Regions:
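Active-site-adjacent substrate/metal-binding segments within catalytic domains
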Residues: 1-6, 12-15, 46-48, 71-78, ...
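Short glycine/proline/serine/threonine-rich loop/turn segments at secondary-structure transition edges
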Residues: 29-33, 130-143
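Short strand-edge motifs at loop-to-beta-strand transitions and within beta-strands
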Residues: 19-23, 122-128
Length: 208
């Protein structure tokens, strides 16, 4: 868990050792040089639960960075897509955004679906369909690109894209099905660990 400080003022607190945490520094920064400090705590509410089968280690295990965003922007995008080709896009935007457009692009760069709408209370929900989609599976992980563009009254303020797949995951009569086909999952209990750097693992460590 961590507290974030900027120029001697506390910005926020996060208590989760395995997920990212984001903090809005806007009202704490000033022109020129700023001091950003992270206060790391050794223990948290979940320490004893997390230590059932791996080492107790504390500290920052992944990257820390500062970035800027436009005042009017896309806050979040979520897409759900099933094997029938139907998809739903949920986009959250700031209040200055007046229009949201979404395009679905296939692997050949062709636009196979398009929708647009004006946000209501900072949110847009768009539904569409892609005819005969290439389905995602572990064996053939076919992906499409969702491009989301937000505009104010005149100009595009931000555009982002994410990759996604059409698939349906369900459990019927105790059997896990992906796109209607039974799937058997085998796994191993593995924790990210480097003998010298602890929880700080490189891409090479992950591949190995």
């Amino acid at each position: 868990n961590v507290r974030v400080w900027v120029n001697g003022k506390m910005v926020g607190y996060s208590e989760d050792s395995k997920l990212e945490a984001r903090f809005d520094l806007t009202k704490y920064v000033k022109d020129g040089e700023n001091l950003i400090a992270l206060e790391i705590f050794r223990w948290c509410d979940g320490s004893y639960l997390e230590d059932q089968d791996f080492w107790r280690l504390s500290g920052i295990a992944r990257g820390v960075y500062v970035y800027t965003r436009e005042k009017e922007r896309i806050e979040d995008v979520n897409v759900m897509a099933g094997m029938d080709g139907n998809f739903t896009v949920n986009a959250k935007v700031t209040k200055g955004v007046k229009n949201v457009r979404v395009s679905v692009i296939d692997k050949n760069g062709n636009q196979v679906a398009y929708r647009e709408a004006s946000p209501v209370k900072g949110e847009v929900v768009l539904n569409g369909n892609v005819q005969n989609p290439s389905l995602w599976s572990a064996e053939i992980p076919s992906l499409y690109t969702l491009k989301v563009t937000a505009s104010d009254k005149k100009d595009v303020v931000e555009s982002t894209s994410i990759d996604f797949g059409f698939r349906t995951v369900e459990i019927k009569k105790g059997q896990l099905l992906v796109n209607g086909q039974p799937v058997l999952i085998k796994g191993a209990d593995r924790h990210e660990m480097n003998a010298d750097k602890g929880y700080v693992v490189s891409e090479e460590d992950m591949i190995r």
